[in-house]
């Protein structure tokens, strides 16, 4: 029996308040309106950015259905949708691509002006949410809301992917993998034979390492205070691993001494202001490129001496690895299917959706790289 055009009752993980666990609720998901797509979710990754909402570091209206790293199958579409059809395998896009704004038309930029990321409204483009629970509207989260058995997204925030792709793996392309991998191959444009330093060895940091290796870097130095992460970093391409706590001097000085004045490319994948500075200083003063990948704390500012850039350093950042999402996600899935990069080593746990709070405990304790929740 078709559910198209009807309200669907399903389970979702609702965050009602900051610093509280998720609650599995029975919610109602209204049909998609014009230029919207309703998706039956199959799998979703648990990302640090979701936890930033729980802690208040990333501000979005509550109550909300979080989650932004998922994959599923189109259940129905609203009027005017031409990019996908019911039955298509898709990845929702937290970084949309309208194709019409100045940024989408820019050949190098990818942060669509219709993105809900900088100042989250908690709604779709139309101005409301399709979620309700106990008679109350539940907000969306950055165009996606993948912590629900069904979600509704705008058609500018969904990409059709290979129908043979395993959704419990390629869901990582919806955020963490693409963010890290693209930071190396597209944002920094790592060159063959170069030396790289990667600060932070979570799922995104390890994806940076995969990107550096794919780009032909000769040395990839992994930096983390958790030595338990070193084996996985080396498995994925790190040539050396160092712990800042093992040294009496600042880690940037250690890296400068190891690399004849500094690395060619550095990546901060933690989201701390002090490590952003360390990553910048660890790259060569005259030719180094440092990329900010980690999401910094809300409303905190970083001060620095302009002389650090005057000799030729470059300091840059990007959302979603610099990829134009609708264009790039299908290609990244195709590359995965062609075995151009691995995803399996990033997935340390697979849990049923109902165990979402256990997944966040694993994330906060540092015991997981990526936990995938299946519906």
From Swiss-Prot:
Annotated Zn(2+) 2 binding sites: 98, 101, 104, 112
Chief place where the protein resides: cytoplasm
Intracellular or extracellular location(s): Cytoplasm
Class in the EC hierarchy, top level: oxidoreductase
PROSITE patterns the UniProt entry points to: ADH_ZINC
One Pfam entry name: ADH_N
Cofactor note: Binds 2 Zn(2+) ions per subunit.
Gene Ontology terms describing biological process: animal organ regeneration; behavioral response to ethanol; ethanol catabolic process; response to progesterone; response to retinoic acid; response to steroid hormone; response to testosterone; retinoic acid metabolic process
Residues binding NAD(+): 200-205, 224, 229, 293-295, 370
Gene3D superfamilies (alphabetical): Medium-chain alcohol dehydrogenases, catalytic domain (3.90.180.10), NAD(P)-binding Rossmann-like Domain (3.40.50.720)
UniProt KW keywords: Acetylation, Cytoplasm, Metal-binding, NAD, Oxidoreductase, Zinc
Residues modified as N6-succinyllysine: 234, 340
Tissues with expression: Expressed at high levels in the liver, small intestine and eye, at moderate levels in kidney, ovary and uterus, and at low levels in the spinal cord, thymus, heart, stomach mucosa, skin and testis.
Positions of Zn(2+) 1 binding: 47, 68, 175
GO-annotated molecular function: alcohol dehydrogenase (NAD+) activity; all-trans-retinol dehydrogenase (NAD+) activity; identical protein binding; zinc ion binding
Top-level taxon of the source organism: Eukaryota
Named cofactor requirement(s): Zn(2+)
Catalytic activity, EC: 1.1.1.1
GO cellular component, one term: mitochondrion
Modified residues (N-acetylserine): 2
Catalysed reactions listed for this entry: a primary alcohol + NAD(+) = an aldehyde + NADH + H(+); a secondary alcohol + NAD(+) = a ketone + NADH + H(+)
Record family assignment: Belongs to the zinc-containing alcohol dehydrogenase family. Class-I subfamily.
Assembly and binders: Dimer of identical or non-identical chains of three types (A, B, C), which are coded by 3 separate genes at different loci.
Protein name, entry field: Alcohol dehydrogenase 1
Protein species of origin: Mus musculus
Name of the gene: Adh1
